[in-house]
Amino acid sequence: MESTLNTTARIGSWSSFISPPLQVCESFKWKLPKATRRVVSVADRQNSNFRWRKVTTGRANVAAEAAARVPTSVPVRVARELAQAGYKHLDVRTPDEFSIGHPSRAINVPYMYRVGSGMVKNPSFLRQVSSHFRKHDEIIIGCESGERSLMASTELLTAGFTGVTDIAGGYVPWTENELPVEE
C-alpha cells in the first residue's frame, strides 16, 4: 500500500519534516494487542534510495525506537573508506560464498545457511557475532546483494548493537568497483 505523506509529520512530542512526495510501505509490524498499537512512518534507506516504512508498535517513544531499528546503508566505496578508518567488516554470506572471495579482513558469520534449494536463518547468529564484536564496535555489514545484510543489520540494532552500517548492494558492487578482495 503506497501513499503520499504531508510535508510535516507529528507523533506525540516527536516531529520531523518530510520531503514530499514519499512512499509508505508496510514492512515492520510487531504483534501487539490492537488497543496498544500506534502507527508511525520512519525513514529507511536501502540501495541508496530513501523509502518510508509504516511501523506499528505500542511503545511510548515509538518514533525514536522504530528509527533505531532501521540501519544506515552506504554504497560500497563509502564502506571501503569506513573499513580504512577502522570499522570492522562483518560478512554475513554463507561459508561457501565467503570462501570464493571476500573483502579484506572481513569476518564471516553467516546470517543464513543453504538447505536444499532454500535458506534458513542461523539460530546462533547473535551469539556468534557477539563472540567477534562488542555492542559498541563500529561494524560494516555486507552480503552478496544487500538483502541478508540489511536483515542482519536490523537484527543487530534490535539486539543493542549501536555502530551498525549496512553495505548497500553487497559483494556484487564491491567486486564491480574493483575494491580489494581476498580468496
Curated annotation (Swiss-Prot):
Superkingdom of this protein's organism: Eukaryota
Induction annotation: By darkness, ethylene, cytokinin and heat stress.
One Pfam family, short name: Rhodanese
Transmembrane segments: none
InterPro entries assigned to the protein according to its UniProt record, in alphabetical order: Rhodanese-like_dom (IPR001763), Rhodanese-like_dom_sf (IPR036873), Thiosulfate_ST/Rhodanese-like (IPR052367)
Record function comment: Is thought to act during the early stages of leaf senescence.
Name of protein: Senescence-associated protein DIN1
Gene from which the chain derives: DIN1
